[in-house]
């Protein structure tokens, strides 16, 4: 039986009751986080907590118990017997339930807090071959830095990729490559690692941040600078990053083969160093 966390309680998923007046349901008025459990610990929980607090602040959602998340996330792992597995915890916090109105509820209502955990098998094979992705105009709003649950442009775009047998949709805004529907993207051009800088047009990925740190430690030259779509023919390597895929090579983008069509050497170094870091944390 699956046990979830709902407004301070551990209950079964079937017992969860969310009001139809919940602003998450009516307006997608909420934020989320996803943290990964590596058979004994959450990777960079501090990074996720900092981003969660920022997202809540930007949406002016006042969840006073934010710091309880690490504790109940771990409890969810344990209650659901996932300690010895690779697992994820999803957290969603909405502004709460109040009669539908564009302005925020007055007086304040309590936010709705929901979290659940699940085990999964990492995509080891895909990391060897790399993935193919499509390119598409970035149809999202201009606050992509907030980890908001308003993901319709992301899901519509990802569905398009999925229906075409592709594993990700990479967005292009004003000729510049921003990020994927649920990942950040990196390029290697003449040995230099490029990724879009932190801005309101991308989500500041926790994996992205750690990759930049790892790459710097390896002495790889880094430029946090957007790559123009029309420079893609000069790209030798590409990879996407997120909490579930970690470092995932991209071998084809927008119908064009990247480099030799196989994961490249810089991607491999970064991916190996990332794996080493995880293994060293496992102790
Ligand atoms: N960008 C978007 C739009 C995302 O949805 C995600 C996944 N949450 C990322 C980037 C990667 O973030 P992270 O590395 O923290 O999983």
Model-derived segments and spans:
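Feature captures the catalytic cores and cofactor-binding loops of soluble hydro-lyases/lyases
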Residues: 205-210
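Conserved alpha/beta cores of soluble small-molecule-handling proteins
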Residues: 1-169, 173-176, 199, 212-283
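Glycine- and Gly-Pro-enriched alpha-helical subdomains that act as flexible
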Residues: 176-198, 204
């Amino acid at each position: 039986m699956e046990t979830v966390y709902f407004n301070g309680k551990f209950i079964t998923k079937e017992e969860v009751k969310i009001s139809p007046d919940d602003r998450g349901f009516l307006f997608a008025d909420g934020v989320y986080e996803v943290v990964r459990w590596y058979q004994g610990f959450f990777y960079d929980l501090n990074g996720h907590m900092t981003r969660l607090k920022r997202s809540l602040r930007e949406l002016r959602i006042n969840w006073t118990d934010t710091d309880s998340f690490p504790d109940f996330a771990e409890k969810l792992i344990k209650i659901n017997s996932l300690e010895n597995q690779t697992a994820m915890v999803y957290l969603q916090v909405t502004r709460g339930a109040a009669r539908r109105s564009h302005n925020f509820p007055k007086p304040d209502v309590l936010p709705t807090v929901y979290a659940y955990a699940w085990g999964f098998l990492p995509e080891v094979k895909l990391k060897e071959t790399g993935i193919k992705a499509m390119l598409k105009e970035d149809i999202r709003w201009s606050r992509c830095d907030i980890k908001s649950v308003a993901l319709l442009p992301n899901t519509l775009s990802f569905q398009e990729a999925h229906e075409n047998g592709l594993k990700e949709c990479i967005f292009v805004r004003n000729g510049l490559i921003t990020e994927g529907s649920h990942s950040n993207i990196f390029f290697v051009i003449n040995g230099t690692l490029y990724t879009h800088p932190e801005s309101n047009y991308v989500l500041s990925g926790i994996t992205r941040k750690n990759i930049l740190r790892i790459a710097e430690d390896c002495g790889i030259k880094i430029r946090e600078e957007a790559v123009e779509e029309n420079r893609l023919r000069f790209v030798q390597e590409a990879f996407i990053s997120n909490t579930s895929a970690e470092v995932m090579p991209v071998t084809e983008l927008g119908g064009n083969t990247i480099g030799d069509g196989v994961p490249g050497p810089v991607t491999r170094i970064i991916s190996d160093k990332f794996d080493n870091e995880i293994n060293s944390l496992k102790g």
